[in-house]
Amino acid sequence: MTNYDVIEAYAEDFTKWAYRNSRGTVKITNNTIVITNVVETNNIIEDDKEPYSDLTIRVTGVTENKYLIVRQGRGKPEAYIKKDGVYTFKDNNLYFGFGVSVIGECNITITQLPTSILKDFSGNKHDAYLYGFKGKLNSGVGIYAQDFKNWSYGSTINNDISTKSYNKFHIVKKKADNWFGFTIGIPKNNYYNQSYKLKFNINKKIDDINFSIVSTDGNLITTAAYSVYINDGSIIDVPIISEEIFNNKEETNIYYDLGTNKDIEIDVELIADYPNQLCYDGKSYAVAYGLPILTDYTVIADRTWFAEKVDNGVFMSKALEQNGAFILEYKQGDKWNTYSYYSATNINIDKDNSIVYQTKNKYNEQTIYPGDKQDTDTLFIGTIRKDDSRSFNGCHGDILIFNRTLTEYELSWVKNNMMCSKQQEPDIDL
């Protein structure tokens, strides 16, 4: 999974579909269709222009007697949706659209689900749909200290050949014998002053060259903030720039300065913290629909909280209204709770261990007390539920959910053999 994959995106824009208002009444947004009245059972809204995308939708408000009709042209059979749930339609064509089986008032909602997903590798097809991820900085795969797309090349760099992405520059000079000098930079108000790692690749064998980070007005006033010698394959730790230098108001920009005039091309790559983990910025979350209703469970996750950024937040949950098998880790100020069948227990968080598990009666080794509420079929990651401000700021790797309480041996085995980022340790053999 890449940062491109997690950016919230949709296959279709419903506002561009043909609305046949003589056939019924529909409220339309980019991603939702709400049918409130039916005059005739033909398509009330349909796609009459190419391309005809594969589409995954969530439908609510249907019954056995008042159901959604999905129909299209070119000989494809109609589909009838009589149960709320998630449905996928592939290889669609002209006039793909929606009608209702019964004339009169109704309240059927068709919600297009994003193409950005967190894949379920269990084979159960319970993919989680990703909302609000930006694919950069602290909202996507790994955490990146800077967004290189916002940086600008200096006057000696060939903009037509050089390239940049959110995490990498490929730098080529205009003239072979030019000094690189102020190679690439950004205004201080867009520079995130924190520590990070850079990796350098150089296309020719050369002696070590000096790499500096400077605070500058871009002309005459310059202060060196950091300097180190680099070569092909070098990885460096860029420190936080001192407040005295960073707050100098005359020097409004930060630049990378490469002290060489060699005829070379240089790649500068920003190395992510928490690589291969999905990172949440408090505004992003994931939702999986149609999960089994659990009467017992074990959930195991490899997660890291950035707890200092969260006052009131939840890692993951199956809560809808006052039901749900678990709310795993609910932070309220300095207090931590966890919920089992909607009964709360105060817990202690082990901040040095990213692997956490919860069963019906235990959070890690701590006893918790389950309530008597029912489970739901929806899983939320990064929030307690959709459209709720109690969110997660942090990262996670593997998440595993079982439909029973695992034994100590099974828990140990799962941590060692199924949690990809967990260092091996002896299985507990009882």
Short names for language-model regions:
Residues 44-55, 184-196, 289-300, 347-352, ...:
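Extracellular/lumenal carbohydrate-interaction signature centered on repeated Trp-anchored short motifs
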Residues 312-339:
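Glycan-recognition/cleft segments
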Residues 221-230, 337-354:
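Short, aromatic/His-centered strand-loop micro-motif at the edge of beta-sheets
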Residues 348-373:
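Carbohydrate-binding surfaces in secreted/extracellular proteins
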Residues 88-107, 237-262, 360, 375-386:
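Extracellular beta-strand ligand-recognition surfaces/modules
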Residues 58-63, 199-205, 302-309, 317, ...:
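Solvent-exposed strand-to-loop "edge" motifs in beta-rich extracellular domains
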Residues 1-32, 106-178, 186-191, 195-227, ...:
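Extracytoplasmic low-complexity segments
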Residues 367-397:
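Extracellular glycan-interaction patches encoded by glycine-rich segments
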